[in-house]
Amino acid sequence: FARAPYRMLLGPDARISGVHGRGCVCFSPEPFVTVRGRSISTFPMKGTASSATQEARRWLETDEKENRESATIVDLMRNDLSMVATGVKVKRYRYISPVETSKGSILQCSSEISGLLPENWRSRLGEILLKLLPAGSVTGAPKEATCRAIAEAEDMERGFYTGIFG
């Protein structure tokens, strides 16, 4: 059991780092954003099912709640990317991929949203991240109202909680 956390760190999506004297560990396969050249993309993951059942894929494709949640978050993330990029569009909507976990394979429903950053994006990276954070796939929608509700309900800052990494 003591080696279980170490084994998890060997996975392809594990990250570990020290930030401001604290250790942070991340196991999420969902990237907040990726940037290649000037292209910025986000891949919100909404909808998970065990791949052990024959019906899992069809359920992910047809479940009304899963479809509505994906539509809401994809629209939110598309709007967020539009604050920092041009030509933002949904490239792939609700594609299903297997994800390997320590407890076996699951099916994950994701979407891909991309746009073009300005030429000077590197000199504005902090500003860009501040406009995009917190990640809409974590907060849900409406993002601003959710953040206000959390701030009112909690007595302390969350610090490094369900954020981005890497």
Where are these regions (language model features)?
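Extended alpha-helical targeting/anchoring segments
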Residues: 1-166
